[in-house]
Amino acid sequence: MDPQPPPPAQGSPPHRDRGRGRGRGRGRGRGRGRGRGGAGAPRAPLPCPTCGRLFRFPYYLSRHRLSHSGLRPHACPLCPKAFRRPAHLSRHLRGHGPQPPLRCAACPRTFPEPAQLRRHLAQEHAGSEVDLSTQRAVKEEPEASWGPQDEGVEQPATVVVAGAEEEATTQWPAGDSAPAAVPTSTDPRESEAKEAEAGAAELRAELALAAGRQEEKQVLLQADWTLLCLRCREAFATKGELKAHPCLRPEGEQEGEGGPPPRPKRHQCSICLKAFARPWSLSRHRLVHSTDRPFVCPDCGLAFRLASYLRQHRRVHGPLSLLAPLPGAGKKDDKASGGRNSGKGPEGGEGAECGGASEGGEGGHNGGDATPARPPAGEPRFWCPECGKGFRRRAHLRQHGVTHSGARPFQCVRCQREFKRLADLARHAQVHAGGPAPHPCPRCPRRFSRAYSLLRHQRCHRAELERAELERAAALQELQTQASQSPQPPQPLKQEAEGLPLPIAHIKEEPPSPGTPPQSPPAPPVFLSASCFDSQDHSAFEMEDEEMDSKAHLCGLGGLAS
């Protein structure tokens, strides 16, 4: 017989209950020890003064404060992207072509990412007893302490352990002992102070680096309206060619080094000869040369080329104007744009109602799976951190951000005046342009170089226009009163004045003289049929009147009627 286990002692719970009770007791005791302020007591959270987010360590708080500064001092040398932290930049650089791979110690396979290597070790070599350390195939530069007197001595190799992605251990040659480890302090207060000091130093360094980066003048608008690159002294006719110029790209992003090559521009406009890489871009560009603006705002009367422009404009009038449907909402607008904006958010698409109204007319308040409500239209959603000015679109905020930077890279070649935007420089160049101004006033001989200057000038003629309108209304009223007071003399019929035969309806019957036999009624004209009299249809007489009037008119023009 199998030996049975001894019964539990009297008064003691079974094994399972005893284990559970022990676990619960340990957990409660450990928690009580922490709460009493022992060595493992929780630290007070550190709030961010800008957004109120809580952090456990000062270093994390100092690193988080970089996100509110908007600075990205670590720029990628291969593309225009920039990052706030060096770790993010190093992780981004792995996607730019071949990087030194990680070799597996158990097989000849290599992996570009440490996470992929760890996954490979867990799946392929989980049950085998192999050295799970892997070595990265990187040619490390010798340190400063490794001088020429140490030639022929084996140098240490940097080995990446599979269990940690960022940590590295140093293997020293056999027979040599590793340098003695520096004793580290175990006081948590000293470690917190060091972390806070390191975070503050990193923050100051990044702020100083970002403040020292100043943009220098790169582009000059010449007298012949060409854009001159000040680095290589090459001129360009359009802004697009200037942007594609290698000198204005970030360092390292030259042809064949970083990023895909630019797409060739095969679609050219036949009017202005501007080229585009995609056909829908050319179709959308052709609307610039068209004067047709079929989409009219029902609130202010402004007209637009595309329905998406009208929807964007109607946000200015507030949320009530967005409830009314657009004119021609059932049509699929922006056909020229190739449907790029169709059905993708409030900037484009077929629907015209606010809030994603359905075709059934239920509107955007049908509940259920409705999208979350957007902020009220007409109110700013993006605020400038420098001056507090609000904008409705993020693009407007980016354009406004140029005003707070001291860089003025665009300079006028005639008066040496500097500007922050290329559009401001082009508008200023109209001052030096020869010939008359392109915007004349229809009321006076003055001309203006800018359209908004003409609109501002036309306010001077507002009183003159109102006076002319009052005079015109008074003259019209006087003519109406004169016409009502003086009776008009009876005018002879047009047929009598021109000597044409009168129609039958206008012939007056003379009474017969006494003694004359009664005459039979005259025969009907040839063009009439018996059916006209039977059905009492008098349209034939009206047709005859119209024919006679047209013949008389042709006779008056020179006898063209045959």
UniProtKB/Swiss-Prot annotation:
Role this protein plays: May be involved in transcriptional regulation.
Database matches in SMART domains: ZnF_C2H2
Keyword hit for Zinc-finger: yes
PANTHER family: ZINC FINGER PROTEIN (PTHR24383), ZINC FINGER PROTEIN 579 (PTHR24383:SF14)
Gly residues compositional bias, start-end: 340-367
Entry's family note: Belongs to the krueppel C2H2-type zinc-finger protein family.
Gene that this polypeptide is encoded by: Znf579
Protein name, UniProt field: Zinc finger protein 579
Single GO molecular function: zinc ion binding
Keyword Signal: no
Annotated keywords: DNA-binding, Metal-binding, Methylation, Nucleus, Phosphoprotein, Repeat, Transcription, Transcription regulation, Zinc, Zinc-finger
Organism annotation: Mus musculus
